[in-house]
Amino acid sequence: MNSEINQRFLARGSQKDKGLAVFTSGGDSQGMNAAVRACVRMAIYLGCKVYFIREGYQGMVDGGDCIQEANWASVSSIIHRGGTIIGSARCQDFRERQGRLKAANNLIQRGITNLVVIGGDGSLTGANLFRQEWSSLLDELVKNKTITTEQQEKFNVLHIVGLVGSIDNDFCGTDMTIGTDTALHRIIEAIDAISSTAYSHQRTFIMEVMGRHCGYLALVGGLACEADFIFIPEMPPKVDWPDRLCSQLAQERSAGQRLNIVIVAEGAMDREGHPITAEDVKKVIDERLKHDARITVLGHVQRGGNPSAFDRILACRMGAEATLALMEATKDSVPVVISLDGNQAVRVPLMECVERTQAVAKAMAEKRWADAVKLRGRSFERNLETYKMLTRLKPPKENFDADGKGIEGYRLAVMHIGAPACGMNAAVRSFVRNAIYRGDVVYGINDGVEGLIAGNVRELGWSDVSGWVGQGGAYLGTKRTLPEGKFKEIAARLKEFKIQGLLIIGGFESYHAAGQIADQRDNYPQFCIPIVVIPSTISNNVPGTEFSLGCDTGLNEITEICDRIRQSAQGTKRRVFVIETMGGYCGYLATLAGLAGGADAAYIYEEKFSIKDLQQDVYHMASKMAEGVSRGLILRNEKASENYSTDFIYRLYSEEGKGLFTCRMNILGHMQQGGSPTPFDRNMGTKMAAKCVDWLAAQIKANIDANGVVNCKSPDTATLLGIVSRQYRFSPLVDLIAETNFDQRIPKKQWWLRLRPLLRILAKHDSAYEEEGMYITVEEECDTDAVA
């Protein structure tokens, strides 16, 4: 089924007769508060009566003060907090019919027939059972004279929508569950911190991470920190695993590596079903290798801390979509889970997802390991393949001849053009190792176009890129210089090094440069090689992709800074902060940071604003302050307007807010480029580069003659690899020209603009802002392949 994005008109107050409740159940995860906030505020916008059910199903059974009406202020200043403000508990009573009968009565007395369930597969299964029994529960309540027949008729259908909150990412049907990205942040922060002490003392660290039945955290954490060995439930090693582990670690030490990291998921076991614990691994290393091995059990640290920007935005989108799904539900509607498919919020039948999730557990219990990995989805499968390849010490012998030359080896080059961005080094490492694994030779071009012309080119070996994944910046060096006017010198260098395929990693400049080189193919035969671009810039302003490498790290930096800036006004007086973000003419950072930071407004170039809009926002801020809100946050993209500068907006708010609030201005600058790349950027760089190696090899193979001369003339041999909707896509550069605004260096169409109405709905106080209605995009269910 092809996906369709339907625009629907949602009028303010259009659902006045409906009652909706939101609750969190099971284990907590970071981002749940953002989901609760989005559900509540979207429901208030639509005119519903909204309730919190505190302490999960237990609160539903107990009733009384556990079910409280929520208002706009109930969910203020919670988006940045971990855990769940409404509490979560495991509930034995709800498992019994008598408990569910009490819960049904408590809901009916308050007119609640719409439930948003935020939890894991157990919580969602319980909610579905409750929905199926609803009619018989009501019959019993009427029979007991607990409710009237009028109430039974009025509330005869219960609608439920699920949101999956779980740090394990163990739910089939969604690419990411709420909390997983933040848990990965905690794991990577811990490993990055431990690496320095391990390096100092030549230690082996064994890190135990959560994941009793799912190895996602261990697997992706291992990819993001270059772990030497991982143990996960879906890929149990053979009983001789101690031999393989020791052989791998010993080889790495002899190759000069000072630190080793082994990650163990808490549910790890061998093929016979015997558990493998961190203690077992330490014992093996101590006895056989005599290494100084230490154990770190992360435990509940992974559940804690502030949610990442990704989890906040995911929860905002899912929470709003859950409310809309409930409002549109009919008595015949199948209950759905709001899932993430690639970069799209979709609705997926709840029980299909639950059954598939349970099928994974069944496959593992029956020792059908390959089936278990397959059921986890393509994303998990590819992560596993990538991990296995990248952690080999040496490329496989069968890909090389007796002289050590690659049997089907080509000569590839990689370079950066543009500003540095986090994730570039991870992409280079992956590109180098994937290519060498195949038998290719890889050249690293230092300092972009200028370095190429100067001959600053060297062959990169397998161990040259060790330890690159977790490092920010660009180790190869990068400059913004474009090739225009220097084609002759560039062609001469490509000829000198016999380059047969080129990868360019960088921002808008890399896309522009690749296009310029491809345009000169008729004049310079050396340019008739396959060329591919990986977009890498915090601005996220490159056409042909929805995310560029580095923008997640930039977004997290801004979100974290906004949290700190806002906290600086805690306990003092009413204050508004005006913050300027980077991004050139692209408003991605300002908009998404606004959504993740709970900003009141975000001014960007793509959405024109007038003095009237600014005035309206000042009045809105004043009315919020008058009703007890103590802090306001305004974001402005650096090139949002030539005349309405950050200073102008700051002065306007300062003048108009006299007597009500004070105003402060912050220009964030280069700290937004980030320190250490986020797990998202590390893994995106790793996967994208792996795909580029396969693509370059396929293009060279199809266009090479007997003498080894590559002749690529067709437009589809110069491409940009991007994430588009649900999958990775290689887009010919010539096709992207029509989609590009070269003057402002931005794409003409940008997916995130459809999130701006959501930003305004979640920021506007009911009494402060009256509008007839608002267009917001409702994204429908889709069953195509997810981004893998």
Curated annotation (Swiss-Prot):
GO terms for cellular component: 6-phosphofructokinase complex; cytosol; mitochondrion. InterPro entries: 6-Pfructokinase_euk, ATP_PFK, Phosphofructokinase_CS, Phosphofructokinase_dom, PKF_sf. One of its GO terms (biological process) is fructose 1,6-bisphosphate metabolic process. Nearly 90% of the PFK activity in adults is localized to the thorax. Its cofactor is Mg(2+). It catalyses: beta-D-fructose 6-phosphate + ATP = beta-D-fructose 1,6-bisphosphate + ADP + H(+). Mg(2+) binds at residue 121. Homotetramer. This is ATP-dependent 6-phosphofructokinase. It comes from Drosophila melanogaster. The lineage of its organism: Eukaryota, Metazoa, Ecdysozoa, Arthropoda, Hexapoda.
